Each structure stands twice: as C-alpha cells, then as structure tokens.
Amino acid sequence: MGSQKNYLSDDSTGGGFGVLFKWTKDALFGSRITPSRKYKEFAQDDTNYKIKRSVGKSAVGRRSRSNSWSGLDSSFYQKYDLLEDEDEDDDEKVFGMPSHLVGSGGSRSCNGDDIVGKAVPFGLDSQRRKRLQSLLDPVDLHPMREDVDTFANNLKFHNTSKLDSFDDLMQTPRQDKEFISKLFGKDTGNEPEPMSYRQFPGKFPSPGKNPTSSTKIKQVDHTDEYLQLLDKLDKNSKMIDSLNREVQNKKQQTKLQESNYKNKYMQTRNELINELRHSKKLYDNYYKLFQKYQQLKIISKESLELQNRIPTLDDRLVNETLVKDRKINELQKRIQSLQIANENLTTQREIDILKYESRIKELEAKLILQNDVHSQFHHSTSTYNNNNEFLNTDYDIDTLDTSFSRHLNINNTNYKP
C-alpha cells in the first residue's frame, strides 16, 4: 500500500511493458535517473564527498561560492530525487566540534563490501541520512515493490490522510483507493490484474477465443459494500446518540443521587453535632463527679488515718490524766502541808504579838513609874531631860518595831512548803 505497490497493478503504465518502456525512455532521454545512472552518480558523489572531507580536515578549508541552488528548500530536492549540497561545517553545527572529530558510529554499517557504510555523515538529519543511505545502497537499489513511475506518481500524488469531500464519498469507490481497501481489509495494490496476450512479446491472439473477453479487465463493484458501510455508520451514529442520551440520563441520576446524599450527609452531620454536644455535657458532668470522687477519696483516706490515731490518742490521754491526777494529789498534799504550816505560823505570830504587846505594856508601865519617881526628886526640866536620855539609851520604840518586823521576815523565809 502507498509507496510499496506492485508495478503490475498500475493502470497508467500498461503493465510490465509500460515499466520497461519508461525505464528505456528515461535512460535514453535522461528524464529519469535509472538505477545504473544512480549508481554512477553515487560513485562520483562518494568520491567528491571523500575529497571534500579530506579538504575540510586541512587547516585552510575552502568553501564553494553560493549560487541560486544553495537557497532551495529540501522539499525541492526530495521532489526530484536530488542530493543537497553538503556543508563542511554541518558536523560542527550539530555537535559543536570539528567535522574531523565526528565519528562514523551513527552511520549505518553494511555487510562486507559496503563502500558507503562509513561515508554517510553523522551530522545530517535523519531524513537526509535515510534518503542518502537508500541511494548509496549497492545491494538493492530499487526494490521490486517500489513504484518508479514518475508520471504516475505525479498524477496520483495526494494526501491520503485528509478525508475526501461528501461528493467523493457518494461516488463509487475506486479499486485502488487506500481508504476503502483498509476498511474492507483488502490490499488492492497487491492483487495482480489478469494479464492479456498483448502484454507478452510474440504472443498472437487465438482464433477460437474472443479477444474482447480475454482482454477485458474485470471490474469489481464495491457499491453494495460501500452502502452497507454507510448503513453501519448510520447505525453507529444512532447508537452513539442513544449512548449520549443514556449518559445524560445517568448524569441526571447521579446529580439526584448526589443531592440526596448531600441532604443525608447534612442530616447525619447535624445529628452528629448534637450527639457531640450531648457527649460533651456528659463528659463535663463526669469530670465534675470524678473530681468530687477524688476529693471524697482523699477525705476518706484522711479519716482512716485519724481513726487509726484515735487509739493512740486515747492511750496518751489516759496516761496524761493519770499523770495529772498524780500531780493534783501531790499538789493537794502540798497545799495541806502549807496550810498547816501557815496556821502554825499564824499562831506563832499571834503568840509573838501578844508577847510583844505584853512587853510593851510592861515597859510603858515601868516608864510611867520611873517618870513619877523622878518628878518627885528633881525639877521638872531636869527630870524631863533625864527621862529623854533614858529613853534614848535604854529603850527605843522605833528599834523595837524594826526588830520585830525583822524577826517576822526571817521566819517567813525559813518556811518552805
């Protein structure tokens, strides 16, 4: 299919003779490059290329003067099977190094006697390298399935990737149309046409056979298949429409489901929020009760400790009461003894007082008697002076009182309960 067609299936060439005629005409008039001419030109190009690379390696490299052919597009060379002028600095532009440092590892190696395996420059683009390698291949210059008819290719050249117009679709398809042949799974280009006696040299028509029937080419009509294909396309379009409707219905159903799910989600969310609030209240109450429980636990622990201390305190209290009772008894005994001593002292003091009073009375009586006696024998003045001197020397009331008080103080200090 495409570029790989059998040359016998070409209607414009007239079969194998047409191909031979084209090759002969191209070889004589030079309108088409024949395989032998391509090989000769390749040999010359290879020689020029090697010379050019050897010159490019020298320090002083020459560059050809630019002409009107140097600015042409690559499509022009591809259209007429021409080789583009190579630039000696292509390798430096591609790899950033001199051309003599670029190896031949990227070139396609050939078997044995390949004279161009190391001559293809690595710096060229892939399309130019493939085209140059196909031209320089000495093993198979033109495959059998490659169409070399220039005029037929120019007539049939069109972009098969683009869809034809509606008028072309409604027409009966051609036998060699690539789109139809791919749809039906048939390779029309590979099917050889029935050959007639006119295609062979020295062949004459047989008198018993109808020359028109033998030379008539069988035409296959694909109209029914084409209509069936259109019916299938129509059915497929209807199925696509139904699928679109189903998809739209499913989208609407999914939207309704999403809205229902959203409402249910909001309901469950509100319920969850309420439950969370209720659980928060429960937790707060539980926390308060737990704190109270901790406090009661501490109080109970303290109460147990106090209860454990009660027996010891009772024992201590009993001991202290006993000690206090003993002290009280001792104090009471001491009080009694002191009271007895006090009574004794009071009685003794009273006795002493009575003694002192009686003594004082005696002394006063003596004094009176002495005063009466002196008054009789002496004058009043002299008796008075003598009485004063006697009082001053023999008896003094102040000294008597002080001695009595001193005696009382000594008795009080000596008494110890």
UniProtKB/Swiss-Prot annotation:
One of its GO terms (cellular component) is spindle pole body. The keyword Phosphoprotein does not apply. It is found in: Cytoplasm, Cytoskeleton, Microtubule organizing center, Spindle pole body. InterPro entries: Bbp1_C (IPR029330), Bbp1_N (IPR029328). Component of the spindle pole body (SPB) required for insertion of the nascent SPB into the nuclear envelope and for the proper execution of spindle pole body (SPB) duplication. Connects the central plaque of the SPB with the half-bridge. Required for proper localization of CDC5 at the SPB and for proper M-phase progression. Homodimer. Belongs to the BBP1 family. This is Spindle pole component BBP1.
